[in-house]
Amino acid sequence: MPSARLQQQFIRLWQCCEGKSQDTTLNELAALLSCSRRHMRTLLNTMQDRGWLTWEAEVGRGKRSRLTFLYTGLALQQQRAEDLLEQDRIDQLVQLVGDKATVRQMLVSHLGRSFRQGRHILRVLYYRPLRNLLPGSALRRSETHIARQIFSSLTRINEENGELEADIAHHWQQISPLHWRFFLRPGVHFHHGRELEMDDVIASLKRINTLPLYSHIADIVSPTPWTLDIHLTQPDRWLPLLLGQVPAMILPREWETLSNFASHPIGTGPYAVIRNSTNQLKIQAFDDFFGYRALIDEVNVWVLPEIADEPAGGLMLKGPQGEEKEIESRLEEGCYYLLFDSRTHRGANQQVRDWVSYVLSPTNLVYFAEEQYQQLWFPAYGLLPRWHHARTITSEKPAGLESLTLTFYQDHSEHRVIAGIMQQILASHQVTLEIKEISYDQWHEGEIESDIWLNSANFTLPLDFSLFAHLCEVPLLQHCIPIDWQVDAARWRNGEMNLANWCQQLVASKAMVPLIHHWLIIQGQRSMRGLRMNTLGWFDFKSAWFAPPDPE
């Protein structure tokens, strides 16, 4: 019998007997475990061989045998739990232990660095599953980061300085304003073993032609081996950076036929997905990666929803209490903001916008927040911390305003906290705030009726590229803000847009109302090197490494 099954049977027997040694019979014990008399005898003999109990059998009618426990079910359960932790079977651990507080304590004690069979393993605790990793779909901040570890694109953007770098394409040139040429490196392999072909690249880029920022791609051809020509309908100075974004990452052309591709994707990046469940994401260094092989062999993201209620509970990778910690922090390049929906009469009403933005000002939200949030929130007066575009203007409550609808996406505890504060403030002015929580996909599409939307945005480097690119790619914003997005996109591509002025106009009209900048924090280990927090609150796994202990 497998060891795990035998351990479960012993724990069950110990629990049924309340851990007490006793006189009993095979029939009684078999009834407790719902098995045959013969199987019960086999179980007892095997457990006795393991040293967990003794079984002194008595022969004869009416005679009772002696069962003595030498090991407690709790001790064996702890041993089994330790085994499951080492095997990264978090789903089975949750079933075994049951108590969430105990599971959390066990997980935290095993965070950080692990060295097993010559491999460096990093364990990270996160508050929600990361089930959708498909480039080009609606991806949240953390999914965007993970996708960058799994996939490659023609170009890549350095997370630390925002500079453009080579990736699958080793060089590129602009032939004319409407014609770009990229030179691809040969010998690139997908995680499932197949070599990347030009058809994979062409299919991946044609797949995203329906997205607003890629809709100006007229044709993609390969005039000679490992050469890719991209023809545009309008000039685009940002095209090389655009092709380094997550939507433009390269997929195997047969991706739609591969099982569960969104949760178990196959790319050409430094890490390959090994497991992705509601309890755990495991990625492993790809030995055939065309760039520098990752220094950390395996990254395990353990999911524990309970840490979502902690203000700084986004990403935890600190180990045991006795180990030295290293804290990395930065103020996010972005903010939480209110988005007024011009499709509803209250959302489009300028008086409503002025009054709501006045009573729900950043300082009011921070003032009414609990102290634990006040330490991490910074009032926002622009979409970026460096901007001060918002002006606080006293405004009177519009006559007849009795209720408003606020919508945000679920699995985000701070959305609930901020919405609760808003509800409290508006109630003091006799306005009822109806709150809707919807899925991220529903939020992204923006087809649901709501007066106001509570959103958050994290912009990546370089900011003059990503800010407009991010806002333009969210259908919800295009639905809510009635401007000519296509004309603005053309100006942005040509380098004719003053981005600060464009954002200031959105804030001045109260289409978007900045609320809070958030401090992003990673609590790491002193032994980890190369940990540089990016603007998404994560770090590049392949560049991090563990320093060996000092020689004795």
UniProtKB/Swiss-Prot annotation:
Region Solute-binding, residue ranges = 163-492
A GO biological-process term: positive regulation of DNA-templated transcription
Drop me one GO molecular function for this one.
DNA binding
Q: Which residues cross the membrane?
A: none
- A Pfam match: SgrR_N
* Stretches assigned to the HTH marR-type domain: 1-116
Query: Which CDD domains does the protein's record reference?
Result: PBP2_SgrR_like
Q: Does the keyword Nucleotide-binding apply?
A: no
Q: Please provide the record's keywords in A-Z order.
A: Activator, DNA-binding, Repressor, Transcription, Transcription regulation
Residue numbers of the DNA-binding region are 26-49
Q: Which domain of life is it from?
A: Bacteria
Which NCBIfam families does this entry report, sorted A to Z? PRK13626.1
- What role does it play? Activates the small RNA gene sgrS under glucose-phosphate stress conditions as well as yfdZ. Represses its own transcription under both stress and non-stress conditions. Might act as a sensor of the intracellular accumulation of phosphoglucose by binding these molecules in its C-terminal solute-binding domain.
What HAMAP family is this protein classified in?
HTH_type_SgrR (MF_01449)
PANTHER family found in the cross-reference section: HTH-TYPE TRANSCRIPTIONAL REGULATOR SGRR, PERIPLASMIC BINDING COMPONENT OF ABC TRANSPORTER
What is the name of this protein? HTH-type transcriptional regulator SgrR
- Source organism per UniProt: Escherichia coli O157:H7
